[in-house]
Structure formats: C-alpha cells, structure tokens
Regions:
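His/Glu-rich zincin catalytic helix
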Residues: 1-72, 109-111, 181-287, 327-328, ...
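Histidine-acidic residue clusters that define the catalytic metal-binding segment
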Residues: 2-13, 154-193, 205, 225-231, ...
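M16 family metallopeptidases and their MPP-like homologs
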Residues: 25, 30-44, 52-56, 70-115, ...
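Short alpha-helical functional segments enriched in proximate histidine and acidic residues
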Residues: 60, 114, 118, 139, ...
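Short, conserved secondary-structure transition motifs
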Residues: 133-139, 229-244, 350-362, 566-567, ...
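Extended, domain-scale alpha-helical bundle/helix-rich regions
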Residues: 401, 405-414
C-alpha cells in the first residue's frame, strides 16, 4: 500500500442510553488500545469563582474512587502493562489510557471510575493544593513559559482564554472541598463528555463493556449543559509592551490573531503562519536564524481551540542589539505575504507538509484517538477524513484575503522581556505605520523553490537481484542483508503499513572526544545534514518536504544515529539523500556558523532554567568539569574553537564499514530492500578501520553534598551516583527495573511517598543511563524550600529501605509489566524501532539481544534487584545537590 492509496476508514459512533457519545476507530495492526475520556470543561469555561478548578479536579480524581481507593489506579494500570495520565486545557479535561487490547474491560472500568465514582477527601484537597501551587511556581521559573503566560494575560481582554489553565496561587489557595466536589458533580456528566477508542477490539464486546461500566452514569440535577461559546474574534489594538524579569536573557514575542479550529478559514491562516514562522523552512527562520544569525530559534505557540485565540511568535535573540532588526524583518516578511509574495511552489510544499503530517498522525493509536477527539471538539469530523481534499482546495488568493482580513497591522502586539530596558528604548518609537509600509531590503532575494523531483532510483535503474547468500532470514519478520561492500543491513518486515522507518548508527560519539576537541562529533554530524556534494541544504529541504520524509541526528553518549521516517514509495529517495549526507557532506561554513551560534545561545540560556541549571551543577559534582559525559555539544569555548578542518578530519572516522549498521522497518519485500540499499550504499568503497575506541573522561568531586541558593522560590534536589556498565547485561536490566520502582511512573515509591502521601513534591523522578564502561543514576525532587529537609530525608529513606530490604514481588511484577508494555507502545513507531535496532547492533550486540528484551526483563529476580541496589545505592556513594 502506497501513500497515494492512503484512505482512512471513518470512526463509528454510538450513543449509550444516558446520552454518552462513544467514538471508536478499529486498527488491528497492533494488539493495543488507546482510550480517551473527554470532559468538556477546561479553563475557558470557568469563572472568577472557580479559576483552576478543572485542573484541580484532574488531580483529585486519581486520589480515590469507589473501587480503587488510595491511588490504586496508578498501580493497577502499570501492573497490567499500561500507562495512564491526564491533562487539562482551555476546552476540556482528558484522561487517556494506553493498554494491551486484552485489557479492554479493565481499561473501561478504570475510566468509568474516574468519570463518576471519584471520592476524594478534604485531606486529599489539602495535599493536592500544595502540589498544584508548586506546579505553578515551576511554570513561573521557566522564563519563556512564564513570558508566554504574561502575553496570554495581556493580549486577551474579554476572552476566557486569558486565564491560566492551572489557575493562580490565590484561586487555588482558596479552593475548598465542597466547591471542588460541586464542580466535579456538575461538570462530570454524560451529556458533557465523550469517549474515544482507537485500536484493536471487537465492536460487540466494546459496546457491551461501555454499557456495563458507563451505563449507570447519569446527569445530576443542575448538571452543566455544554454550549459552544461566542466564536467572534477578539479585536486587539496595536501595542508595544516591555516586561522586566530579573536575570532573564532576552525574549521577543509578536502576536497574530488565530481563528477557531471550526472556522472555515482557519486552515488558510495555518498555511500563512507556516510560511511565515513555523519550522526551518519558514521565512523568518531562514532570515533571522540562518542568514542574519541574530536569533537562536523561533517558535510559535497556539492559544486557541473551540474559541478563537492568538498565535505567539517567540524569538530567542542571540546577544544584545538585535530587537529592532528582528521587528523590522518581521514587518518586511509580513508585508511580502500581504502583497502576493507566496508562489504556487511554496504553497504546494506547505500543503504537502500538512497532508503528510495528517497521514503520519494515524501511525499510532494515541495520535489517532487524539486526532478524532480534536475534530469532535471542532464539530466537524468530515474534515478529519477528507483533510487532504480540504487542504488541496485552498487557493493563494484565499490565503491572501485571510491575511488581509485577520492580520491587520493595527492589531499587532509586540512584547519584550529582559533584565534591562536599554534596548527597548530603541524600539519604543515603532508605530503601526512601520508595519503598513515597512522599509524593504532590496538586497534580500526570494529563494527559488523547485519541485523537480530527485531522480527516482527505484524506477530509473534496473532492479538489482540479491545473491543467494546476501539475505538471511532470522525469524518470521527479521532479516539481515549483506551488501557487496560488506555494509550490514537489518530489516524488519511489517505488513500493511505505508510507513518506513530507517536509521544508520555508529559508535563514533562524544566519548571518543578529548579535552582538545569536545563538541566535534556534535558539530560534525549536525553540519552533515546541511548539504551534500549533490544537493544544497535548501534543495534537501524541498525534496524531503515534497516526498514527506525527515532526517535527523541523535547524539547518544556512545553512539550517533541518523534516523528518519518516510512513506514506502519514497524510501529510495530518502535513503539516497541519507547516503549523500553521510558520505559526501559539504560542511558549508555558513551553516557551521549558524549551528554554532544557535547552540551557544541555547547553552547560555540553560542557566535561566532552574531545573537544567541544577542538573548541570549536580553532574559537575559527579563527573567533574573536564568530562565528555555531559552535553554532546561541549562548552561554549570548546565550540568556538572548532573549525571546518576539524569537522572534515572527524568525518573521516565515519568511514568505518564494520561500525555502521543500517536498519529499516517497513512493508517492502526483503529483495526490494536489498535492491534499494545496494543502489544507495553498496557501490561505495569502504575501508576496514580498527574498532572505535571509547574513552569516557570523568573526575568526581571530593565534596558529595552541595547547596546553592538563588532565591528561585522552589527547591530542586538532585541525588545520584555511579552505576554498573551496560556490558553487565543482567545487572543493567535489573537497574532499569529498579529505576521504575524507585522513581519511574505513578506507581513508584518516590511518587507515592513524596507526592501522594506527604504532598511535598510537585514532581519526582529517577533516571538511569549507561555505556559499556560506566553507568550513572539520578533521582530528583522539586519541592518548596521549606520542605527540603523532610523531602531529602524521605528520599534517602526510600533508598536505604531498598538496600536493606529489597523490593516486593508485587513491585517487581508491576515494573516488569510496565516496561514491557511501554516497549510495545514504542514499537508502533517505525522510526523508533529502526533506530533501536541500529543502535544496539552498532554497539556490538546481535539482533537476538533486541528480540530478547522482554525475556531479559522477565528473568530479573528479587535477588538481582537486591544485589544491584547494594552495589550502587548505598549512602556513601550518593552525590547530592540542592538548588533553592
């Protein structure tokens, strides 16, 4: 099946006798289900008496239900190999559950409990109140997120979208048990909800269980009746606004009106904003990030939904002195869009982006359910099933008229956040007229876009037959291929999929670097994406967008992976581009400079984010300052010192034939995979170099406890240490299970004790990472500064208890089932599968190691866990850092 043959079957709809709408979409490709319960209440439907209550209820429902008291849901779901979570936005509260399909009945029972059998207590309210206040503080400590929320509150005047979803410290503090219970009973009713199911199921069985568990749910007296609110666009006035934030690097935000999702011209403005500001192909990105190099990044946030809202274009300036220039470039590019500047070729590529994204959204159960639910809110599911036709029908003149009608200069708002206002004084004189008639830069030439397709290797060259010994079948679905130049290809065949995942991995990585060339692997492999001997970077962008594939590089400590995803009919084109950038990169100095400047700005901004800053300080305690185990890019000074010649020299290490592994996952025959890969890679002469030498560098601090005070209003505790190497497979597997028990998902000890029992922490977690020679672990707690001592004591108590008494059989089983379940969910993603296989084989493992993951997890015993804990978690091995 090819992408041009792609058709989406319509989801079925059913109403229970109580009025609850059930939407179900059958996809039997994997034995999984995703179920989403949507309650049509979010922050946009709250008033001044209940700000943040919808989000508050989302927290409280998990605390206790009739059949699952004491947070039992958070244990039952992972024990059955599933995952459950929830979110609240402007329009709804959504509870979403991923489970093996054989757990359908249990899944529906659990969601029904959340829907109408929650029985939280005043004590629960008190604990969650403290947690939500910490969550609000966490957002306030994010300079970019906090700035976005400030713009949200200033931009809207009458729209309920101006209020934060979490509420405020004041509104949450005053929330009482009775008011919250009333909010739950009033809004959590079948007439104000719907359920979406995507995955593998039998319809008769599904409807039987829906009626059994959701049938008793009834509207209460005075129940909320959902109504579509006024969708009139809010008229804003031109505004220039400066906001002071102590210690903040600079951020610039410019707003543009956004139409409600159900508006007939919402897609027209979506195309316009993509042309202007979304992605690396947008005009603003190419001007400000790539050409002028005065912005590190440009992001667009959408504050919209059922109601019309706003798009916030967020600019991260590099250094000082560029704010006026950024605003002028924005004015120029907006002016060009208004004056017939978009040509058919540019529009065609944006349409391809949108349509390809729509097709990819059906790759996983969760994405499919989310897409169906979004259209249910918009009130027009027809659009979901015919999105390609809707997008193809949009005309250039319609887009221009939409821009003229809705992106008026007099409604623009410009916001600037900084720790000083010196630069703001240079732009305060800007008026509406500067956007109506901006000074245009005659030197800026419009980039030509060619839709001429790359040579189709599948059709222009004869099929290359495989020799008798070049394809070996390993199992029912897996094959190994040997190309004529000895390059190894691993292939997994999955039937009836239009998607292909591919990845090529090498153990050439940052732990081959020394103090003299830190960051060279990151910079080299990042620059390889920016043009080849045969295609410039803009041409590669256009080709990938036209054919609907993407290429990216992933930097692990011990491997580097180039990975991507495409449609099966475009695999020859995608692999040809991949082979070009790997073997014949140009290392254009313009793009090297762009990567360096953007990366260095991001490194500078890291210290603005307390969570990132705290982890860096902890990692320095563990590994020292002269290490190659921290971030892949190295430091700012190390990046500055690297030159084009350094990159070319490092690239020579990428010509190791025995180090490469190309992995592909798709529905093409193994013989055709051989033919395609032989064309793209098989004719390249490769040299037989010696094995890669990994040299991890680290020197721990003699001080194992450090406290830093920055008055951030929160405390961040990092506690961790070294762990066993990945080469000890048995212990490594045991540590992954141990990590889940201590601080993994909602069933972990850290979550249950620090968050649920005592309410000290808004967020807890436990991370574990390892390479062949060393591993390290890190646990973290975000809490109020006054709770640092009891939080640290509880965390140390958890670790001490496990070292002395081990874990329970129930904890072991839950963690095993959870890890196996998550692996199955991840396997829906063909790109993830390909990169996982390539990564392991590049490190010297065979395919059996990948295939036996579940068996290794099942074989871990309580004794293995106890031994592992006592090897690495004892108090004398802890490195503790506290930032407050």
């Amino acid at each position: 099946m090819f992408k041009n043959d792609f058709q989406i079957n319509q989801a079925a709809q059913h109403y229970l006798p109580n009025g609850l709408k059930v939407i179900h979409y059958l996809d039997a490709s994997n034995p999984l289900i995703c179920i989403q319960l949507h309650i049509k209440v979010g922050s946009a439907k709250e008033n001044d008496y209940c700000r943040g209550y919808s989000h508050f209820i989302e927290h409280l429902t998990f605390k206790s239900t009739v059949n699952y008291p004491q947070n039992l849901i958070s244990e039952i779901v992972p024990k059955n190999g599933g995952s459950i979570n929830a979110y609240t936005d402007f329009d709804s509260t959504c509870y979403y559950l991923m489970m093996p399909s054989e757990k359908l009945e249990l899944s529906l029972k659990i969601l029904s409990e959340l829907a109408f059998r929650a029985c939280f207590t005043p004590a629960d309210v008190k604990i969650e109140k403290d947690i939500i206040i910490e969550e609000i503080k966490q957002y306030e400590n994010d300079p970019e997120g906090d700035f976005g929320e400030y713009i949200q509150q200033q931009y809207f005047r009458t729209s309920p979208l101006k209020y934060p979803v979490l509420g405020t410290v004041k509104s949450v503090s005053k929330a009482g048990y009775k008011d919250l219970l009333q909010h739950y009973k009033t809004n959590y009713v079948p007439s104000n909800a719907f359920v979406t199911i995507s995955g593998s199921y039998y319809e008769e069985e599904l409807l039987l269980y829906m009626d059994r568990y959701f049938g008793p749910w009834m509207d209460s007296e005075g129940a909320f009746q959902y109504q579509i609110q006024d969708k009139t666009e809010e008229v804003s006035n031109f505004r220039m606004d400066y906001r002071y934030r102590k210690g903040s690097t600079d951020y610039l935000g410019i707003t543009l009106p956004e139409l409600a999702e159900s508006h007939p011209y919402s897609d027209h403005l979506l195309i316009a904003i993509r042309a202007l500001a979304i992605g690396k192909s947008s005009r603003l990105y190419r001007r400000l990030v790539e050409k002028e190099k005065i912005c590190a990044s440009i992001k667009v946030s959408s504050l919209c939904g059922v109601l019309p809202g706003v798009s916030i274009i967020m600019f991260n300036p590099i250094g000082k002195g560029h704010i006026r220039q950024i605003i002028e470039v924005f004015a120029q590019e907006l002016y060009h869009l208004l004056h017939h500047d978009m040509e058919a070729a540019e529009l065609e590529l944006i349409k391809r982006d949108l349509i390809n994204g729509w097709i990819y959204s059906f790759e996983s159960m969760e994405n499919t359910a989310s897409a169906i639910s979004a259209e249910e809110f918009a009130g027009d599911t027809y659009k979901l099933y015919n999105y390609d036709k809707t997008i193809e029908a949009i005309k250039l003149e319609e887009i221009r008229l939409s821009i003229i009608n809705y992106w008026k200069a007099e409604s623009l708002q410009i916001y600037y956040q900084s720790s000083d206002n010196k630069e703001w004084k240079s732009v305060e004189s800007i008026t509406v007229q500067d956007f109506v008639a901006p000074i245009l830069n005659a030197k800026i030439k419009k980039r030509a876009i060619s839709l001429k397709q790359i040579e189709d290797y599948a059709n222009s060259v004869e099929h290359i037959p495989a020799s008798p010994n070049s394809i070996t079948r390993i199992s029912e679905s897996y094959y190994t291929l040997q190309l004529t130049n000895s390059l190894r290809v691993t292939y997994k065949h999955i039937p009836n999929k239009i998607y292909c995942g591919f990845a090529i991995a090498s153990p050439v990585s940052q732990i081959m670097e020394t103090g003299h060339n830190r960051g060279v692997n990151y910079l080299t492999t990042s620059a390889m994406l920016y043009g080849s001997k045969y295609h410039t970077y803009p041409q590669i962008q256009d080709i990938s967008r036209q054919h609907g594939f993407n290429l990216r590089v992933i930097h692990h400590l011990d491997t580097t992976i180039f990975k991507g995803k495409c449609f099966i009919d475009d695999l020859p084109v995608a692999l040809n581009i991949l082979s070009e950038i790997l073997l014949y990169p140009t290392f254009d100095n313009r793009y090297i400079s762009h990567i360096k400047s953007s990366t260095m700005d991001n490194l500078r901004r890291e210290d603005d984010y307390p969570v990132t800053y705290a982890f860096k300080l902890w990692q320095k305690m563990l590994c020292g300052t002269k290490t190659n185990l921290d971030n892949s890019s190295g430091s700012i000074s190390q990046l500055k010192s690297l030159r084009q010649g350094d990159l070319r020299k490092w690239h020579e290490s990428w010509n190791f034939p025995t180090q490469f592994n190309l992995s592909i996952v798709g529905s093409i025959s193994p013989e055709e995979i051989y033919s395609i890969t032989q064309k793209c890679f098989g004719s390249v002469p490769l040299n037989d170099y010696p094995p890669t030498l990994h040299q991890p560098m680290y020197q721990s601090s003699p001080k194992q406890l450090r406290q830093v005070k920055k008055n951030i209003g929160q405390a961040i505790i990092n506690l961790g240490g070294f762990a066993g190497p990945a080469s000890d497979v048995k212990q490594n597997t045991a540590f992954h299970i141990l990590a889940q028990v201590i601080g993994g998902d909602l069933f972990s000890r850290m979550f249950k004790i620090l968050r649920e029992q005592y309410g000290f922490a808004y967020q807890t977690g436990f991370d574990f990472n390892s390479i062949n020679s060393v591993g390290f672990w890190n646990s973290f707690v975000y809490c109020d500064p006054k709770d640092v001592k009891p939080s640290l004591k509880l965390l140390q108590g958890i670790l001490k208890d496990i070292c002395e008494n081990g874990i329970t059989a129930d904890e072991l089983l839950t963690a095993q089932n959870y890890l196996i379940g998550m692996n199955r969910f991840d396997s829906e993603n063909v790109s993830w599968q390909a990169s996982s296989i390539a990564n392991l084989i590049a490190l010297g493992y065979d395919l059996d190691h990948f295939l036996s993951r579940e068996e290794r997890i099942r074989n871990v015993t309580l004794s293995d866990i106890f031994t592992t804990a006592n090897n690495w978690l004892l108090p004398e091995k802890h490195y503790i850092h506290i930032l407050s």
